[in-house]
């Protein structure tokens, strides 16, 4: 039997340069690369549903076009459309064809970004029931311009899972492009992460009748949180020689002012050893790049290190007067630089963690190799700095042993690959006056493998310092015919408008070969056809503002059936002319409730500039819970972005070449404890100055001032300041975040003295109309006493007053706070039945209702009913509703989840589909909230509380019941099982946890896990 293969022979090649909304096609000969005019191009534009990628929303056949004398033609696209192109032409009397986008979705680079909104909220984290206030500064993006957006926009607060919109409103900006908005959060809003979005519609046109809107967003956290009471910092050397004693300094400071005297635990984290050096390709450009989220603030120092909860601390220390020292003696591992992180943890009176971290690198010798640079293509120039450990002093005249090796792999007869090394060179280098050594290395074609430089030297004590550095690689050609070479090297990586960009093009293509240059910035691009004039060419391009904030140059050629491409990488055009200099100043420390005036100054290029300024003053402790996510305004508007373009070819691609409280008789109780002292927008005058007067809250501590400025012509900038509110002698109240009705608990009252006078203080707590008093001496500037309190049964809040007084007639301070009181737990269904008959003495019947032995009921409510139907309807609305209080706890969620699952189970047999639907819907919400409360080692009472056996057991019981109802799966239970096992090892005598762990059932076998994807 004979088989036949149809081979289509063509000498037509299509190259596409796609940018948002446009695809340019270049038709060439496949062999010679010569442009082909008059090629008829037909195109199909398809738009797919962005959620369901297989569903077609629209399909358009575009009008055919023909290539011009340079072989170029252009197609326009609507937002979201993807293109496929087919070209046909007659050459030498024979038909030739080529196609791009065979799968109908290849030629697409996204949708053009037409506008942005810089969103700022009055604080980054909210409690349920609070009101979110915000600003958004809207700008329309143009070629080198950022002008105010003038149309109405939609502001919405969205939950990620399940996808839902919690609040939404439409607002219109003012002449500065500023919108103001307020979004009250429901009392029953679930804790977790949300997204605050601003949607900016685009104007429709005949060519793009349904443009997609731009959406800017910023994360918002909702938590039932209590702010930390103190800061914790570690300072000291970040470099040390192995075995040398190292002392770090720990410092704790109360947010309200004064030292924090606390116990702390130290952990040595990581200990990663490596002598590898990595070139810094950033070259200091990070501050010039686009920023849509201040990730360093949000995810930096606020993130707790991942330490095994079972791990014991390496050291413990006590901060007295807010200070302590941490002596260490760290060793380098394997004779290599070893990077450690020293983590310090302290806890407040309620067990909430406060962390500090300090990176420390331990070197095997007193010399280090740093700041590697690798330059060039085939001929590489490698330079490394030789410095003294600790001081960073450059070491000139240092002799360094250098070896270059080629690392490659050889395939054995049995098919296994064996690693081999070949020494390429060996030399002795001497560091120059700047402390750098330089090594020249040639990457030899045909000698494939990775090239590595190994450096070593010795310090005065005879200890050896080593480093290794990847220089580059030579790849084995996978093609039988030699691929054309095309290398594009820019003269530099930064330009300013008015400059001329110069690039060197190296190629082995014949003289006269056509080259298509493409210059792209943001969503814009332009092409130019040139010819090869020799193996080395200098290309120039004028740099205009339209090429900002970053552009790239690419070259493409077709030859011998292959397509060669070269890219310059991103070339930055930072718009420093659009950077505003902003200053915000405050006064010296003021008393609580005092009026202060903040002064904001804006200038541009050294000259005063009138600008819109958003000003916020927020208590610094809030940012210890969640960092400020608002990006730098200049980087948000003018930061460099990667140009949106893509080049494709219908032929194969060639391989690439890389004050103080007084002594008055009555105590003044501070009660204005707002976290946000100011949140407003102002405009600086023609002299670039604005003054804002506010009344400060009565909460003590530092308030962060954030000033972000914008001009209508696109300039932007920001600055920070600080306003402190303080007293030389002050009282602190350390209380629980929430109380349960009828509970008995404790609170701490503390005096903080910043005068250094010492002496005895009288601490007083008032609650429920009763007053408790204790005397205590000041030690290290503080004195603390615990007092008992009892939560009322029928109130939604408990007001506490705390005061401190030095001696009989000395300074005094008072504080008034309100603690929410929640109901005494959600209902748990216990049911039973019996019969009352005439033959029963007195017509009585006994029914036993039992709860688990380890349970501790807070209250019992008995419902009697003549029929099961009447019983099921008792208290139905209360069971289906979220609690009226705003505090979310593990025990309440677990109990309510269990109750709603019981109710759903009853509703089925009784034929109440509506009741069952409502109960299951609430159960799903409770389940999501319960899973969100899970910490790294189990469940605590609330979010952020240490995991406890009791709370974890309650959560496990509820999860097992949820699995039985089909609301969760075995994989989720497997994850919590592992946490429960770890917690059970720490609390082996906890019967409630043991029972909850057993209720999870057997663990999953490997074959039970779902397949990836």
From Swiss-Prot:
Molecular functions per Gene Ontology: endopeptidase inhibitor activity
Domain of life: Bacteria
Pfam families: A2M (PF00207), A2M_BRD (PF07703), MG2 (PF01835)
Region ranges (Disordered): 804-844
SMART domains: A2M, A2M_N_2
InterPro entries: A2M_N_BRD, Macroglobln_a2, MG2, YfhM-like
The family this protein is said to belong to: Belongs to the protease inhibitor I39 (alpha-2-macroglobulin) family. Bacterial alpha-2-macroglobulin subfamily.
Protein name according to UniProt: Alpha-2-macroglobulin homolog
Species, as recorded: Deinococcus radiodurans (strain ATCC 13939 / DSM 20539 / JCM 16871 / CCUG 27074 / LMG 4051 / NBRC 15346 / NCIMB 9279 / VKM B-1422 / R1)
Lineage: Bacteria, Thermotogati, Deinococcota, Deinococci, Deinococcales
């Amino acid at each position: 039997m004979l088989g036949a293969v149809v081979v289509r022979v063509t000498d037509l090649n299509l190259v596409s340069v796609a940018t948002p909304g446009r695809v340019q096609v270049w038709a060439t000969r496949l062999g010679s690369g010569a442009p082909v005019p008059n090629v008829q191009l037909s195109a199909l534009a398809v738009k797919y549903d962005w959620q369901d990628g297989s569903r077609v929303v629209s399909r358009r056949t575009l009008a055919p076009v023909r290539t011009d004398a340079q072989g170029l033609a252009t197609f326009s696209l609507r937002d979201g459309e993807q293109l496929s192109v087919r070209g046909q032409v007659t050459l030498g009397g024979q038909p030739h064809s080529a196609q791009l986008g065979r799968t109908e979705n290849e030629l697409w680079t996204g949708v053009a970004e037409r506008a942005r909104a810089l969103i700022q909220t009055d604080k980054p984290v909210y409690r349920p029931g609070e009101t979110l206030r915000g600003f958004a500064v809207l700008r329309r993006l143009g070629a080198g311009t950022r002008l105010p957006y003038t149309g109405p926009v939609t502001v919405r607060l969205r939950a990620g899972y399940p996808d839902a919109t919690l609040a939404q409103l439409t607002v219109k900006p003012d002449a500065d492009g500023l919108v103001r908005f307020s979004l009250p959060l429901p009392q029953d809003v679930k804790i977790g992460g949300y997204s605050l979005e601003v949607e900016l519609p685009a104007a429709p046109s005949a060519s793009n009748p349904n443009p997609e809107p731009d959406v800017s967003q910023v994360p918002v956290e909702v938590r039932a949180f209590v702010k930390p009471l103190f800061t914790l910092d570690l300072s000291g050397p970040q470099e040390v020689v192995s075995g040398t004693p190292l002392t770090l300094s720990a410092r704790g400071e109360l947010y309200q002012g004064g030292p924090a005297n606390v116990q702390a635990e130290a952990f040595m984290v990581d200990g990663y050893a490596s002598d590898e050096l990595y070139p810094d390709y950033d070259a200091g450009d990070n501050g010039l790049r686009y920023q849509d989220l201040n990730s360093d603030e949000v995810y930096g120092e606020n993130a707790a290190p991942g330490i095994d909860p079972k791990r014991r601390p390496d050291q413990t220390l006590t901060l007295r007067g807010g200070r302590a020292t941490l002596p260490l003696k760290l060793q380098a591992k394997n004779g290599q630089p070893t990077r450690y992180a020293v983590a310090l943890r302290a806890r407040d009176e309620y067990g909430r963690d406060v962390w500090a971290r300090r990176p420390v690198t331990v070197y095997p010798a007193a010399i280090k190799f740093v700041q590697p640079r690798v330059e060039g293509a085939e001929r590489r120039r490698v330079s490394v700095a030789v410095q003294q450990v600790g001081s960073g002093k450059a070491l000139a005249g240092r002799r360094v042993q250098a070896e270059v090796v080629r690392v490659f792999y050889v395939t054995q007869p049995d098919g296994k690959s064996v690693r081999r090394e070949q020494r390429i060179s060996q030399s002795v280098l001497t560091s120059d006056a700047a402390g750098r050594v330089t090594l020249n290395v040639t990457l030899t074609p045909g000698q494939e493998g990775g090239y590595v430089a190994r450096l070593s030297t010795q310090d005065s004590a005879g200890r050896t310092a080593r480093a290794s550095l990847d220089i580059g690689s030579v790849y084995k050609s996978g093609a039988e015919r030699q691929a054309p070479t095309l290398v594009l090297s820019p003269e530099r990586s930064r330009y300013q408008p008015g400059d001329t960009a110069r690039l060197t093009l190296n190629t082995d293509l014949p003289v006269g070969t056509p080259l298509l240059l493409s210059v792209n910035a943001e969503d814009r691009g332009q092409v130019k056809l040139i010819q090869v004039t020799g193996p080395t060419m200098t290309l120039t391009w004028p740099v205009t503002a339209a090429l900002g904030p970053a552009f790239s140059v690419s070259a493409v050629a077709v030859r011998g059936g292959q397509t060669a491409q070269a890219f310059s990488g991103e070339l930055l055009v930072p718009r420093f002319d659009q950077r505003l200099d902003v200053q915000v100043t405050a006064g010296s420390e003021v008393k609580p409730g005092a009026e202060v005036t903040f002064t904001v100054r804006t200038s541009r290029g050294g000259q005063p500039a009138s600008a819109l300024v958003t000003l916020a003053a927020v208590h610094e402790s809030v940012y210890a819970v969640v960092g400020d996510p608002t990006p730098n305004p200049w980087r948000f508007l003018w930061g460099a972005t990667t140009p949106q373009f893509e080049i494709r070819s219908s032929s194969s691609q060639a391989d690439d070449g890389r004050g103080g409280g007084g002594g008055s008789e009555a105590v003044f109780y501070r009660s204005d404890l707002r976290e946000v002292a100011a949140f407003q927008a102002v405009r600086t005058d023609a002299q670039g100055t604005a003054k804002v007067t506010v009344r400060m809250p009565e909460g003590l501590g530092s308030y962060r001032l954030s000033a972000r400025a914008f001009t209508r012509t696109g300039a932007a900038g920001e600055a920070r300041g600080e306003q402190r509110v303080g007293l030389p002698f002050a009282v602190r109240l350390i209380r629980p975040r929430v109380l349960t009705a009828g509970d008995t608990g404790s609170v701490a009252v503390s005096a903080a003295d910043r005068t250094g006078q010492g002496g005895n203080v009288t601490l007083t707590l008032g609650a429920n109309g009763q007053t408790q008093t204790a005397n205590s001496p000041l030690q290290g500037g503080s004195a603390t006493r615990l007092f008992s309190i009892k939560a009322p049964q029928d109130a939604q809040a408990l007001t506490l007053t705390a005061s401190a007084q030095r001696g009989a007639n000395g300074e005094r301070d008072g504080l008034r706070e309100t603690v929410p009181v929640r109901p005494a737990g959600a209902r748990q269904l216990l049911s039973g039945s019996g019969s009352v008959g005439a033959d029963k003495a007195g017509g009585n019947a006994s029914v036993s209702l039992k709860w688990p032995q380890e349970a501790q009921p807070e209250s019992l409510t008995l419902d009697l009913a003549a029929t099961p139907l009447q019983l099921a309807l008792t208290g139905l609305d209360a069971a289906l509703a979220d609690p009226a209080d705003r505090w979310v706890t593990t025990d309440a969620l677990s109990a309510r989840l269990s109750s709603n699952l019981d109710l759903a189970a009853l509703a089925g047999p009784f034929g109440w589909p509506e009741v069952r639907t409502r109960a299951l819907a609430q159960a799903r919400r409770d389940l999501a909230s319960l899973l969100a409360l899970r910490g790294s080692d189990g469940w605590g009472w609330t979010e952020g509380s240490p995991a406890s056996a009791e709370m974890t057991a309650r959560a496990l019981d509820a999860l097992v019941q949820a699995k039985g109802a089909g609301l969760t799966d075995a994989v989720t239970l497997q994850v919590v099982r592992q946490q429960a096992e770890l917690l059970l090892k720490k609390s082996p005598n906890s019967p409630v946890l043991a029972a909850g762990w057993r209720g999870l059932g057997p663990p999953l076998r490997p074959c039970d896990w779902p397949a990836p994807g």
